[in-house]
Regions:
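N-terminal secretory signal peptides and thylakoid transit peptides that target proteins
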Residues: 1-19
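C-terminal segment of N-terminal export signals and the immediately downstream linker at the start
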Residues: 20-44
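A short glycine-rich, His/Asp/Glu-containing loop-to-beta-strand
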Residues: 35-71, 133
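Extracellular/periplasmic catalytic domains that process cell-envelope and extracellular macromolecules
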Residues: 49, 73, 81, 98, ...
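N-terminal post-signal-peptidase region of extra-cytosolic proteins
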Residues: 64-66, 75, 117
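Glycine- and acidic-residue-biased ligand/ion/polar-headgroup-sensing regions
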Residues: 76-94, 103
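Short acidic-glycine-tyrosine-enriched beta hairpin
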Residues: 94-111
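Ligand-binding loop in jelly-roll beta-barrel domains
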Residues: 96, 111-140
Length: 146
C-alpha cells in the first residue's frame, strides 16, 4: 500500500499517462531500439493527505475554432498533459497560458477550487487533445460550474 502521496501521484500518472503516450509500430526492416525517456515537468506535490481521494483520467479533444469552455472549477487538483495541438487556459481571470503538445500543466495545486476562467483550443486550424488527471475526494464531482 502506498502511503506516501508523492509515490501515489507518480504511480497514478504513470498508470494513466503512459499508455496514452506510447507510439506503436515501426518501419519495416527497422530494428527495435531501446526505450528513451525524458523528464517533461517537475513540480512539488500539493500538501494534502490523499486517503479517501480518487483520480479520474479524461482525454479531452477540442476542435479548431471551438468557443472557449465555460468557467468551471475542480474541488481537487489537476495534472494535465497535452498530447497534440495547443491548449489555452486561464485561472482566476489571469492572462491565458498556452501549453503545447508534449508539455504538462498543473491546475489548482496551490488553491483547490480556483476558477478556470478560460479553457480552450489555442489554434483556429488544428484540434487540441490533452489528458487531464483530476484528483478529488471520493464522492466529490470532478468539475463544478464556475
Amino acid at each position: 500500500m502506498m502511503n506516501d502521496r508523492r509515490d501515489f501521484m507518480i504511480a497514478s500518472l504513470m498508470a494513466f499517462a503512459a499508455p496514452a503516450l506510447r507510439v506503436e509500430g515501426r518501419i519495416e526492416g527497422q530494428q527495435p531500439t531501446a526505450n528513451a525517456s525524458r523528464p517533461v515537468a517537475t513540480k512539488d506535490a500539493p500538501k494534502v493527505n490523499l486517503d479517501g481521494w480518487q483520480m479520474t483520467a479524461t482525454e479531452i479533444t477540442i476542435p479548431p475554432g471551438a468557443p472557449p469552455g465555460r468557467k468551471h472549477r475542480h474541488p481537487g487538483f489537476v495534472i494535465g498533459y497535452v498530447l497534440e495541438g495547443q491548449y489555452s487556459f486561464a485561472v482566476n481571470d489571469q492572462a491565458p497560458q498556452v501549453i503545447n503538445a508534449g508539455q504538462m500543466f498543473f491546475e489548482s495545486f496551490d488553491a483547490p477550487g480556483e476558477v478556470h476562467s478560460a479553457s480552450g483550443n489555442a489554434s483556429a486550424t488544428q484540434p487540441v487533445k490533452f489528458l487531464a488527471i483530476v484528483f478529488t475526494k471520493k464522492g466529490d464531482p470532478v468539475t463544478i460550474p464556475g
